[in-house]
């Protein structure tokens, strides 16, 4: 899974956050993918982010969902930063 993966250090900080974290992260060791998406119905002063954790197939694509969770924007940013620091990689591919 080297195509479509970027090893970029992208950090989100509470004080300077413009947009919530969105997109896919991949952990090659565990074979897991996580998708961050904004919760469309959250109020602008109380933004929420969904995370959807997937098992990946041999091509590094989402195969089966493991769980979904709704987070505050602070929790989502903290989770994103911890995953990036832990070696998860940003996925640039668009999955269908």
Place the predicted regions along the sequence by residue.
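Terminus-proximal functional modules
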Residues: 1-96
């Amino acid at each position: 899974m080297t195509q479509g993966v970027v090893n970029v250090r992208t950090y989100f900080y509470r004080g300077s956050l413009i947009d919530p974290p969105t997109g896919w992260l991949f952990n090659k060791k565990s074979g897991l993918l996580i998708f961050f998406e904004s919760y469309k119905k959250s109020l602008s002063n109380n933004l929420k982010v969904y995370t959807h954790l997937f098992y990946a197939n041999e091509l590094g694509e989402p195969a089966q969902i493991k769980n979904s969770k709704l987070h505050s924007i602070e929790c989502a940013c903290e989770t994103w930063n911890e995953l990036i620091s832990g070696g998860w990689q940003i996925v640039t591919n668009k999955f269908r």
